[in-house]
Design a protein with these regions (language model features):
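Substrate-binding pocket helix/loop in short-chain dehydrogenase/reductase
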Residues: 89-90, 97-100
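Conserved Rossmann-fold cofactor-binding substructure of NAD(P)-dependent oxidoreductases
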Residues: 61-74
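Active-site helix of classical SDR
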Residues: 113, 152-155
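SDR active-site lid
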Residues: 169-242
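Conserved glycine-rich cofactor-binding loop
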Residues: 11-13
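Residue(s) in the substrate-gating loop at a strand-loop-helix junction
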Residues: 136
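A short, exposed helix-loop element centered on a Lys and neighboring polar residues
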Residues: 113-114, 161
Length: 269
C-alpha cells in the first residue's frame, strides 16, 4: 500500500537516496531540505527520473515557521532524518557546541514530532501512523572523541522508546534506524568539526593526535562502508507496517553492539 512520507534532511546522503528509492517504489514523498538552494536541484533530479510523486520543500528545523508549515501537511509517516554532528574530546569541547548539537538533533526534531503526533491524535486519524528516527550505531555505545554527537543519539533512543510505549494506545508506531559508519560524507565532515576550535596553544588534546585517530578509523573497512546497503534497508524499513523497533545495519555492527552491551556490565573503573 502506498504511503505518504515526510523526510527531513533529504538533501543528501541517506535521506536523499532513500527518498528517491521509496518514490520509485510508488510511495508519495515529501522530501525536505535545510536550505532553499537545495530545493531546485532535487526537484530537477526527481523530474529527470520521472518521479511525479516526489515533492521537495524547505524545512529548516531552526525556523519555527518552517516547522509550523510542515506540521500542517498531510502524511502517514514522519521520518526524522536530519542531523548534525560535533566531535572531539568531551572534556574540552566548547559547551555551546554541545548545546547546539542537542538543539539540532534532539530538541527541534522533538518540537516537530510533538506537533505532528498531537495533530494526528486531535483529528482522530492516528491509527496506522508512524514516526521513524535516524539514530546511529552510536546511539548504543560511546567511542572516545565522539561523545557529544552520540550522546544526542542516546537521547533520541530514549525518546523513541518512551514514545513507543506512550503511543501504542493511539496506534502510532515508532522505529529507530541505526546506521554503521557508512561513507556518505557525514562522518567525515563531523570529524573535521573539532579543528574549528581545537588549538594546540590552549587545548591539552593535540590536533595531530586527534586527526590521526580519525584518519586511522576512516582507513578501516568499518569506517568507509558503501551506503547503498543502508539505503536499501531504509527503503524497506521506513514504509513498512511491521518490523523491529530498532534496526541496526549492517549485521556485524549489530553483533558488535550486543557484545559491547554485555561487556559493559563488567566494565571496571
Amino acid at each position: 500500500m502506498s504511503k505518504t512520507i515526510l523526510i527531513t534532511g533529504a538533501g543528501s546522503g541517506f535521506g536523499k537516496g532513500a527518498a528517491i528509492g521509496m518514490a520509485k517504489n510508488g510511495h508519495n514523498i515529501i522530501a525536505t531540505v535545510q536550505v532553499s538552494p537545495q530545493v531546485t536541484p532535487l526537484r530537477e533530479e526527481a523530474e529527470q527520473l520521472g518521479l511525479k510523486n516526489f515533492r521537495v520543500e524547505r524545512l529548516d528545523l531552526t525556523d519555527p515557521y518552517d516547522i509550523r508549515q510542515a506540521q500542517s501537511w498531510d502524511f502517514d509517516i514522519l521520518w526524522n532524518n536530519a542531523g548534525q554532528g560535533e566531535a572531539g574530546p568531551v572534556w574540552e569541547i566548547p559547551v555551546d557546541l554541545v548545546r547546539r548539537n542537542f538543539e539540532i538533533n534532539v530538541f527541534l526534531p522533538l518540537v516537530l514530532t510533538q506537533g505532528v503526533i498531537q495533530r494526528w491524535v486531535r483529528e482522530g486519524n492516528s491509527n496506522g501512523k508512524k514516526v521513524v528516527f535516524t539514530s546511529s550505531m552510536g546511539g548504543l555505545f560511546t567511542p572516545a572523541n565522539w561523545g557529544t554527537y552520540v550522546s544526542t543519539k542516546h537521547a533520541l533512543e530514549s525518546i523513541a522508546e518512551a514514545l513507543q510505549q506512550e503511543l501504542a494506545t493511539y496506534g502510532i508506531r515508532i522505529q529507530t534506524i541505526n546506521p554503521g559508519a557508512y561513507y556518505t560524507g557525514y562522518n567525515e565532515t563531523m570529524a573535521d568539526n573539532p579543528f574549528r576550535w581545537l588549538d594546540d596553544k590552549k587545548n591539552f588534546t593535540k590536533r595531530a593526535d586527534l586527526r590521526k585517530g580519525f584518519d586511522d578509523f576512516f582507513a578501516t573497512p568499518e569506517g568507509k562502508m558503501d551506503p547503498k546497503e543502508m539505503i536499501d534497508r531504509m527503503i524497506e524499513v521506513v514504509p513498512a507496517d511491521t518490523g523491529k523497533f530498532r534496526n541496526v545495519v549492517p549485521k556485524v555492527i549489530e553483533d558488535m553492539l550486543k557484545q559491547h552491551q554485555i561487556a559493559a556490565w563488567d566494565n571496571q573503573i
